[in-house]
């Protein structure tokens, strides 16, 4: 038994065996993809990394050194920051402002190819008016394309009461 891809209305012309439908749709280039940057609309085709480079050209890049807590000097209205770990890897620090009276910071490893997947440890640190807030993880999620809305596995919540762009520098460590 065969059936058309669920993304036929987005341009996919494949007719696939029922038993292969899920596998096909997970990798279908016509599937709508989601971007974790606030205000983004679904897109199709490209990897998240390519999408960000083409559609979010104003997102700033910061180069960091492995195993070093690096300042990012983020503006108050900055929705994200691209971070490169030398020539090894590119990460996206996501700033989610949908949190009432605050923001949530999380990090993802952007990959163009599943072969690029590598485990990176991370630490996000924010110096606030009341002290230092931090979150760390032993595995940074690797993302090629997001076929569902982005949900951070772990994030650092910072209240607007303690956040000030001048007084609350954001630091990131990757290793």
Report the location of each language-model feature.
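Signature of small Cys/His-rich zinc-finger-like modules used by ubiquitin/SUMO E3 ligases
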Residues: 1-175
């Amino acid at each position: 038994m065969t059936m058309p891809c669920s993304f036929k209305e987005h341009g996919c012309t494949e007719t696939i065996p029922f038993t292969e439908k899920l596998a096909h749709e997970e990798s279908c280039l016509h599937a709508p993809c989601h971007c974790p940057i606030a205000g983004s609309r679904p897109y199709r085709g490209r990897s998240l990394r390519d999408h960000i480079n083409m559609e979010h050209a104003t997102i700033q890049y910061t180069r960091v050194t492995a195993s070093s807590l690096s300042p990012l000097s983020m503006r108050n209205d900055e929705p994200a920051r691209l971070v490169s770990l030398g020539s090894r890897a590119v990460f996206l620090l996501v700033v989610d402002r949908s949190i009432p009276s605050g923001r949530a910071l999380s990090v993802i490893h952007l990959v163009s190819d599943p072969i690029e997947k590598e485990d990176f440890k991370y630490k996000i640190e924010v110096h606030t008016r009341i002290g230092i807030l931090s979150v760390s993880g032993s595995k940074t999620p690797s993302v090629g394309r997001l076929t569902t809305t982005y949900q951070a596995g772990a994030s650092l919540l910072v209240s607007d009461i303690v956040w000030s762009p001048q007084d609350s520098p954001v630091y990131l460590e990757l290793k």
